[in-house]
A protein has these predicted regions:
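Primarily recognizes the serine-hydrolase "nucleophile elbow" in alpha/beta-hydrolase
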Residues: 39, 82-136
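Short beta-strand element of the alpha/beta-hydrolase
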Residues: 27-35
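A short acidic, amphipathic alpha-helical/loop segment
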Residues: 45-49, 106-107
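Hydrophobic/aromatic beta-strand patches that form the interior of the parallel beta-sheet core
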Residues: 31, 58, 116-118
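N-terminal cap/lid segment of alpha/beta-hydrolase-fold proteins
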Residues: 1-28
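N-terminal carbohydrate-binding/catalytic regions of secreted carbohydrate-active enzymes
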Residues: 42
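Conserved alpha/beta-hydrolase
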Residues: 47-67
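Catalytic nucleophile-loop/oxyanion-hole region of alpha/beta-hydrolase
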Residues: 61-93
Length: 136
């Protein structure tokens, strides 16, 4: 089965993501922070699994093949939520694991339109300047 997706770009949409429309009509969407890209095997497998639970899916990442969530602007979730609503979704959730679990918690605490949060093994601190090139 070919999975349909709409790509979103930082320059045009304010965030980097892929919207996976469920073939079955639904008004629920999960923002999925999985792996290091929006359409790699982990992201697509997660999207298919979530679609099987009657959800549309928006996968997000900092950039193509970039696992640099340490400096991910939370404002991108606001932009993604607007696109998700424009596509007819009334309910928005977010899921992430490990570093992205922490990011899911932070995004949901800032944006009340995100009403379901699944944070799998989140860190217990906010990561700042974790790369050697980061200068405080």
């Amino acid at each position: 089965m070919k999975i349909r997706k709409d790509l979103c770009r930082v320059e045009k949409d304010g965030f980097f993501g892929a919207y996976f429309q469920n073939p079955v009509e639904t008004d629920r969407c999960i923002i999925a922070l999985l792996g290091d890209d929006i359409d790699d095997r982990m992201a697509v497998s997660g999207a298919k699994w979530l679609q099987g639970r009657n959800c549309n899916v928006m996968t997000m990442a900092p950039a193509r093949k970039d696992y640099g969530y340490h400096s991910y602007p939370l404002e991108r979730f606001e932009k993604a939520s607007a696109v998700i609503r424009q596509k007819g979704n009334r309910k928005i959730g977010i899921v992430g694991g490990s570093t992205t679990g922490m990011l899911a918690l932070a995004a949901a605490s800032h944006y009340p339109e995100i009403t379901l949060t699944i944070a799998m093994t989140p860190c217990d601190f906010i990561i700042m300047c974790t790369e050697q090139s980061c200068k405080p």
